[in-house]
Amino acid sequence: IKKNPSDLPLASGRLITDLNYRHWDEYVETIPHPFLADVTAEGITEGTDILADEPYECPMKPFGGVEQLAWSPDSKSIAYTCRKKSGVEYATSTDSDIYLYELATKQTKNLCKPAGYVAPKNDTSKSKKFQAVNSAENLKNNPGYDINPKFSPDGKRIAWQSMAHDGYESDRNRLCVYDFATGTKQYVTEKFDSNVDDFCWMADSKTITFIGVWHGCVNMYRTDLTGKVEQITNDCADFVSVSLANSGNKLLAIRQSMSAPNDIFVVTPEKKAEKSKVQQLTSENKEILSQLSLGKVTERWVKTTDGKDMLVWVVLPSDFDENKKYPALLFCE
């Protein structure tokens, strides 16, 4: 209700008539749109809404940011992430797509789905897992969560993170590559049995570096357009971002571990992960860390009740003595 009734001037209640009315800790009161404007010496011109008259958000709430948009290298088009659904359909679906907006024509194309695509009807009384939207036939139409597009340096391809299934928020993020010349898509990290997080194109426009978790550590990997995946780093740490540095021979990254907070590193990739050079550039918390005594962190593998191997991280006290007994704090996730 935009205006309180005259007899209830202090009322703070809300009249909810449809989903989705809330994201985590905030009510849906605005619909963000990206705008294009010229920046001149005289100031900024009036912006052009690239989603004009569309009731859909970009970036997507609640966590989306500028990473959900990308300029093409020739500056003639913009790729953006959007879930063009509303009401109950919006609230129960994770089906977002990557769209290409042409600046000259103001035309938009969905890169995930064929022209004229109509999604199978959704029965909200049943699990999405067993519905037509997640059938083998429809999975080729990217019914899952597609986000964060990035153009190749030569502008011939675009890559993004892609989940296979609609309604499954914990699905595996794969790397999808779209070829503008052929209009075809391919998934180049199918051989990597884990999640693809941040990624960047290399200067050759044929290789993509990405970060992914394996056995409790987040390292760097690379993949080519054939689907081959190779490990770049082998650290007992977590890389949380990656971008191209220098002339394209090095990578700029943020890295953290259970013993150190975020700092900026430069990585020089080699064919074997053990030979890649990882150089720390910043030591933002050096003074604070110098005053702390941190315990050793070790990994252990234990057998579960069903005979499988489970990874356990053990963080020892800073003054650990193996001849003494210590109370233990067990954290399960």
Question: What label would you give each PLM region?
Answer:
Residues 85-88, 164-168, 214-217, 257-260:
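Short glycine/acidic-enriched loop and turn motifs that connect beta-strands
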Residues 1-53, 81-84, 90-99, 127, ...:
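Predominantly five- to eight-bladed beta-propeller fold
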Residues 73-74, 153-154, 203-204, 246-247:
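Residue-level detector of Asp-centered blade-edge/turn motifs that repeat once per structural unit
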Residues 39-43, 102-106, 179-183, 224-228, ...:
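Short loop/turn segments that connect beta-strands within beta-propeller blades
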Residues 78, 155-158, 208, 232, ...:
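Hydrophobic beta-strand positions that form the internal "hydrophobic ladder"
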Residues 48-62, 109-141, 186, 190-197, ...:
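Surface-exposed loop and turn segments in beta-propeller and other repeat-based domains
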Residues 241-333:
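Serine-hydrolase catalytic core recognition
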